[in-house]
């Protein structure tokens, strides 16, 4: 299986297919919303029959909190299961991330929140991506 960094980059490549969404394969130093970044949540070692690891990532999406209604509408588009801005749909369009994994599935939206990132408030949520 691919390395964690290769998988991060594969997920980030899928984020690149969403128009006007800034993205990075790691937690960024600077955010200009809307922005999505990839972080590893968990690795389960040797779970498949051939000894491969299963890795769970989260794609964190940040949108501007300047106008609450606009923020919620914008975030909802990224969290939807379908649509031009859907992160799940972008991952589903290439579930092998360019043939580097057996599967990558966006499974859960969680932890919708207002969060401070480098001192600025954003509306945010995580999309869990299971990879094997």
Each PLM stretch: what is its role?
Residues 1-33, 39-132:
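Charged, amphipathic alpha-helical segments and their flanking helix caps
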């Amino acid at each position: 299986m691919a390395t964690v960094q290769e998988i991060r980059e594969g997920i980030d490549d899928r984020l690149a297919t969403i128009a006007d969404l800034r993205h990075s394969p790691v937690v960024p130093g600077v955010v200009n919303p809307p922005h999505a970044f990839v972080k590893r949540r968990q690795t389960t070692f040797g779970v498949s029959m051939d000894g491969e690891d299963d890795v769970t990532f989260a794609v964190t999406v940040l949108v501007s909190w300047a106008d609450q209604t606009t923020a919620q509408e914008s975030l909802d588009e990224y969290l939807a299961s379908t649509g031009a801005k859907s992160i799940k749909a972008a991952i589903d369009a290439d579930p092998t991330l360019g043939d580097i994994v057996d599967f990558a599935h966006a499974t859960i939206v969680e932890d919708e929140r207002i969060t401070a990132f480098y001192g600025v408030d954003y509306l945010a949520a995580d999309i869990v991506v299971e990879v094997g």
